[in-house]
A protein has these predicted regions:
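Beta1/beta-strand and adjacent pyrophosphate-binding region of the FAD-binding site
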Residues: 1-11
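FAD/FMN-dependent oxidoreductases across multiple families
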Residues: 121, 227-301, 307-309, 313-331, ...
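N-terminal FAD cofactor-binding segment of flavoenzymes
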Residues: 33-76
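Glycine-rich FAD pyrophosphate-binding loop
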Residues: 6-8, 22-42
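C-terminal helical "tail/cap" subdomain of flavin- and related membrane-associated enzymes
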Residues: 305-448
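N-terminal Rossmann-fold NAD(P) dinucleotide-binding loop
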Residues: 14-15
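Short beta-strand to alpha-helix junction loop
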Residues: 87-106, 159, 226-234
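Predominantly flavin-linked oxidoreductase catalytic cores and closely associated redox partners
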Residues: 10, 111-245, 280
Length: 448
């Protein structure tokens, strides 16, 4: 069996990329390890901004087909003690994940994409030193499929990327416990009508939030923490001690993980592309990755289309995926990730000062992140941020250690963003660029 584009992973990222390539007239095959009645069942509910349906040309959610669950337009982000809320206005659609993934599968199939469900990825196939397909298992039988280009959309396990040999062109690292968020979702019933939700609220100090769910009398209380689910539960206890939550009863829990680390430096190698959670393309502020991955895939689809038409799919021919992404959303995300990684070391009272003085958590920044616009981080904005922290030290509300840590984090954020803006236009100089990036990321460290 042969095709132009082979995609491993058929959920949101795999389906989006399949549609993009199939509508260009290429033969596309999608493998997914889950059966058709289980695909996209990691969580029941997920959210997407309404404007992103038009932005990415996605099929709309509908009550008629069971994809639509609810809708809200106001989001709040509050301090550790529930003060100084920052408001974002962006209509959000809540959807049933399994049903919407199936709809995206059908959407890709409309343009000719072929899906093979229950196909467990085994290993890449190489010919002449380049990937030319994969081996997989279905119904207990080992099979092979060949392709001009293989795309890893297999989620955070990154089955294809992590099975590539060292030095192939894309890093093959696996995620450790401090490279991801451990997410616990409490689906709850709200006991008082006055507490029914018409929007969401987040408390980034605890990495917690409350949002509507499919039951209009209910809510989802979520937390994402590094290292382990037990750490998440310990932080949730502190959250409950400091934030007054509406009276509620637990209905059920969902647990999962999402990447929270830097992306591979390169997303492309000979006959190969990695994207989605397999490439750690999640938003620094909340760990979500569906639409941020689509930004990357729009770039990848354009570059790959040109490469396939020229019948040239070497690393050099796909390199523009790296430069276009790393110099735009990639650079902005690196800046935010660096700042937040250092900011989490501040104490709750210091975060209160951050919120009161629009340090990091300002409405312009929050709205830019929400809408996907360019993040307003001009030199003046950054300079005022550092000055505000320094004033907090003089007032005795910010410790000198926090000034050093957060201020140093801002400087590292500037350094890593500027470095990504200088991403090499070709593989020449890439190794040298990586060595410097490694040094900066080592200083930034991991989220705690």
């Amino acid at each position: 069996m042969c095709c132009d584009v082979l995609i491993v992973g058929g959920a949101t990222s795999g389906s989006f990329f399949a549609r993009r390539m199939a509508e260009q007239g290429f033969s596309v095959t999608v493998l997914d390890s889950y059966s058709e009645n289980k695909i996209g069942s990691k969580y029941d509910i997920f959210h997407m901004c309404k404007r992103d349906f038009e932005r990415f040309g996605l099929p709309s959610a509908s009550k008629d087909d069971g994809t639509w669950a609810f809708e809200f337009s106001e989001g709040l982000t509050s301090s550790p003690y529930g003060n100084f809320p920052k408001t974002t206005y962006d209509t959000v659609i809540g959807m049933h994940m399994h049903e919407y993934v199936l709809k995206m599968n059908r959407w890709a199939k409309e343009k000719g994409a072929r899906y093979i469900y229950g196909a467990k990825y085994l290993a890449p196939i190489f010919e002449g030193g380049r990937i030319s397909g994969v081996r997989y298992e279905k119904d207990g039988e080992e099979k092979e499929i060949f392709s001009r280009v293989t795309v890893d959309c297999s989620g955070m396990n990154a089955y294809v990327r992590t099975s590539l040999p060292d030095g192939y062109g894309v890093e093959n690292f696996r995620l450790g416990g401090n490279d991801m968020f451990y997410v616990i979702l409490r689906y709850v019933k709200l006991l008082r009508e006055k507490d029914y939700l018409n929007g969401s609220c987040g408390w980034p100090y605890y990495k917690t939030w409350i949002a509507p769910q499919h039951d209009p009398h209910g809510a989802i209380l979520g937390i994402g923490a590094c290292n382990s689910f037990s750490d998440a539960e310990e932080i949730y206890k502190k959250f409950e001690e400091n934030i007054s939550l509406p009276d509620h009863e637990i209905q059920y829990f969902e647990r999962g993980t999402t990447p929270y680390c830097r992306c591979p430096y390169s997303f492309a190698a000979d006959n190969f592309i990695v994207t989605g959670d397999a490439a750690c393309l999640t938003k620094p502020l909340n760990g979500e990755g569906i639409t941020s991955s689509m930004v990357h895939m729009e770039i990848a689809a354009r570059v790959l289309t040109r490469a396939l038409k020229k019948n040239r799919t070497r690393k050099e021919d796909l390199w523009e995926i790296n430069t276009l992404y790393n110099k735009t959303q990639g650079a902005d995300f690196c800046f935010l990730r660096a700042v937040l990684t250092k900011a989490v070391n501040a104490k709750a009272d210091e975060w209160e000062y951050f919120f009161a003085n629009d340090i990091i958590f300002s409405e312009p920044l929050m709205n830019a992140v929400s809408t996907g616009e360019e993040i307003p981080l001009t030199p003046d904005v950054i300079g005022n941020m550092v000055k505000s922290i320094a004033r907090g030290v003089k007032k005795g509300v910010i410790t000198k250690d926090t000034l050093k840590t957060v201020g140093g984090g801002v400087l590292l954020a500037i350094s890593i963003k500027n470095h990504y803006l200088k991403f090499p236009a070709s593989p020449d100089g890439f190794e040298k660029w990586c060595k410097k990036a490694d040094k900066i990321w080592q200083k930034i460290g991991k989220m705690q």
